[in-house]
């Protein structure tokens, strides 16, 4: 990608609102407005990781995006999350997220036939929290909640190489 396109994308994705569920029992969503890639408050920090891909993820003919963000709620975990930003005809809006892993190492993020392909390292059960060693190559599909209630992202395959 050219530098100008990357700078423009980083400005957009680093200065928008992302939503997080406060838990199924509360049925609430917390909004985090990023400024220059960061949202910081006590016990709730969100960062844009400068990893993104464009595609038509809801198949409406408009350019959507998928980005990697991290969330930290005050503990030792930095939850790497895939966020789908869907074009509503005027702007990109965060519609769905999928937690990838605590401190995942993202090797690559690509668009493939309207889906997101991620090559990354995640934690094996016996890994220390500092260093994931399990390599996975997953394909993620955005699912419009109006078409399939309760589902927003589907993992289509999980290719694991130990």
Residue ranges with predicted function:
Residues 1-26, 105-162:
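Acidic, small-residue rich beta-repeat scaffolds with periodic aromatic anchors
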Residues 1-46, 93-101:
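Blade-edge motifs of beta-propeller repeat domains
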Residues 42-43, 72-77, 126-132:
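Short consensus segments that form the blades of beta-propeller domains
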Residues 47-52, 67-68:
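N-terminal post-signal-peptidase region of extra-cytosolic proteins
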Residues 52-60:
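Acidic, divalent-cation-chelating loop motifs in proteins
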Residues 59-70, 114-119:
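Acidic/hydrophobic-patterned starts of short beta strands in beta-sheet-rich repeat architectures
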Residues 63-66, 77-81, 102-105, 132-137:
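Short, surface-exposed coil-to-beta transition loops
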Residues 80-100, 151:
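Extracellular C-terminal loop/segment signatures of secreted glycoproteins
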